[in-house]
Amino acid sequence: MAAVVAATALKGRGARNARVLRGILSGATANKASQNRSRALQSHSSPECKEEPEPLSPELEYIPRKRGKNPMKAVGLAWYSLYTRTRLGYLFYRQQLRRARNRYPKGHSRTQPRLFNGVKVLPIPVLSDNYSYLIIDTQARLAVAVDPSDPQAVQASIEKEGVNLVAILCTHKHWDHSGGNRDLSRRHQDCRVYGSPQDSIPYLTHPLCHQDVVSVGRLQIRALATPGHTQGHLVYLLDGEPYEGPSCLFSGDLLFLSGCGRTFEGTAETMLSSLDTVLGLGDDTLLWPGHEYAEENLGFAGVVEPENLARERKMQWVQRQRMERKSTCPSTLGEERSYNPFLRTHCLVLQEALGPSPGPTGDDGCSRAQLLERLRQLKDLHKSK
């Protein structure tokens, strides 16, 4: 009987949440339209035009972010252009790096390495909530760094492990993922810097395309093109077959535990296609994200899908971890399919919660993309409690 009462209560709460979500979306849409009108009036009434940073190409979309801890917290197209295309962005990153080192001298989270048969994955907490990674061939003593934003922290881990850094894999150009490329590549003369040529990766030496493979010792790492967060965003898939273990996905800012990255340089359709790329991987694939966003993301997932018991169980585990400042990564893609709303745009429960969309639903790409965009709007407005 208690279970029946609880289920009934959850169902009622879900209906209330659906009404609230539709109201928020309506307000957000109206506010966005008002902002667009204001910008149009300002552009026509301005007596003179000052030199502006080089804008993003017309087909790209920038969605402002509400205030938060992420280095991308400042909003606006002009700021994004400055952050990614000028020295001001680098100086801002250096300021964030100094502050994080002072606040978290031992890192923002306590991490645990994963050991396989001759392979070690070591998460390195950097900045206020980022993760860099060392992927180590323990027999050859060779290491690959993923998104080494703090060269000091990454170098300390390299020395502690007693390995030789031979490659840097950069998921995208943002300084909180690429800021350590220069120092580490200079310190390790044989180190190659891999990334997308579309993304202006600092100190890039070896451009990668979709499905290219980087081989280091027994490490076989495949690059997958996943544009949306940036034009040239890549994720990296470590093949588990050579070491007879699970494959590992280093997802940068594409996919987080119960969340996904914001669409700074693309459309909802682009981001949906990129998410579908990783959805095609196996359920046992380990997800190593670029940020520690688990608790906030699961809180939002509970707003849009309050009856999801998998989300509730994961949230309880995450809260226990974070009370002790323990890292929440990795999760698995199988887990993410069960509670991550950005991977569940095909689910009827989300379609009902966010309201009807024009045209067919289900597997139709356009309608799923529209649902993804609505989820993103809500996530940007969401404040965890």
UniProtKB/Swiss-Prot annotation:
<dbReference type="InterPro" id="IPR036866">
    <property type="entry name" value="RibonucZ/Hydroxyglut_hydro"/>
</dbReference>
<feature type="compositionally biased region" description="Polar residues">
    <location>
        <begin position="31"/>
        <end position="42"/>
    </location>
</feature>
<comment type="similarity">
    <text>Belongs to the metallo-beta-lactamase superfamily. Glyoxalase II family.</text>
</comment>
<dbReference type="InterPro" id="IPR032282">
    <property type="entry name" value="HAGH_C"/>
</dbReference>
<dbReference type="InterPro" id="IPR001279">
    <property type="entry name" value="Metallo-B-lactamas"/>
</dbReference>
<protein>
    <recommendedName>
        <fullName>Probable thioesterase PNKD</fullName>
        <ecNumber>3.1.2.-</ecNumber>
    </recommendedName>
</protein>
<keyword id="KW-0496">Mitochondrion</keyword>
<dbReference type="InterPro" id="IPR035680">
    <property type="entry name" value="Clx_II_MBL"/>
</dbReference>
<feature type="binding site">
    <location>
        <position position="253"/>
    </location>
    <ligand>
        <name>Zn(2+) 2</name>
    </ligand>
</feature>
<keyword id="KW-0472">Membrane</keyword>
<feature type="region of interest" description="Disordered">
    <location>
        <begin position="31"/>
        <end position="57"/>
    </location>
</feature>
<feature type="binding site">
    <location>
        <position position="229"/>
    </location>
    <ligand>
        <name>Zn(2+) 1</name>
    </ligand>
</feature>
<dbReference type="GO" id="GO:0004416">
    <property type="term" value="F:hydroxyacylglutathione hydrolase activity"/>
</dbReference>
<feature type="binding site">
    <location>
        <position position="172"/>
    </location>
    <ligand>
        <name>Zn(2+) 1</name>
    </ligand>
</feature>
<feature type="binding site">
    <location>
        <position position="177"/>
    </location>
    <ligand>
        <name>Zn(2+) 2</name>
    </ligand>
</feature>
<comment type="function">
    <text>Probable thioesterase that may play a role in cellular detoxification processes; it likely acts on a yet-unknown alpha-hydroxythioester substrate. In vitro, it is able to catalyze the hydrolysis of S-D-lactoyl-glutathione to form glutathione and D-lactic acid at very low rate, though this reaction is not physiologically relevant in vivo.</text>
</comment>
<dbReference type="GO" id="GO:0019243">
    <property type="term" value="P:methylglyoxal catabolic process to D-lactate via S-lactoyl-glutathione"/>
</dbReference>
<dbReference type="GO" id="GO:0046872">
    <property type="term" value="F:metal ion binding"/>
</dbReference>
<keyword id="KW-0479">Metal-binding</keyword>
<dbReference type="GO" id="GO:0005886">
    <property type="term" value="C:plasma membrane"/>
</dbReference>
<dbReference type="Pfam" id="PF16123">
    <property type="entry name" value="HAGH_C"/>
</dbReference>
<feature type="binding site">
    <location>
        <position position="253"/>
    </location>
    <ligand>
        <name>Zn(2+) 1</name>
    </ligand>
</feature>
<feature type="binding site">
    <location>
        <position position="291"/>
    </location>
    <ligand>
        <name>Zn(2+) 2</name>
    </ligand>
</feature>
<dbReference type="Pfam" id="PF00753">
    <property type="entry name" value="Lactamase_B"/>
</dbReference>
<dbReference type="InterPro" id="IPR017782">
    <property type="entry name" value="Hydroxyacylglutathione_Hdrlase"/>
</dbReference>
<feature type="binding site">
    <location>
        <position position="174"/>
    </location>
    <ligand>
        <name>Zn(2+) 1</name>
    </ligand>
</feature>
<keyword id="KW-1003">Cell membrane</keyword>
<keyword id="KW-0862">Zinc</keyword>
<feature type="binding site">
    <location>
        <position position="176"/>
    </location>
    <ligand>
        <name>Zn(2+) 2</name>
    </ligand>
</feature>
<keyword id="KW-0378">Hydrolase</keyword>
<dbReference type="GO" id="GO:0005739">
    <property type="term" value="C:mitochondrion"/>
</dbReference>
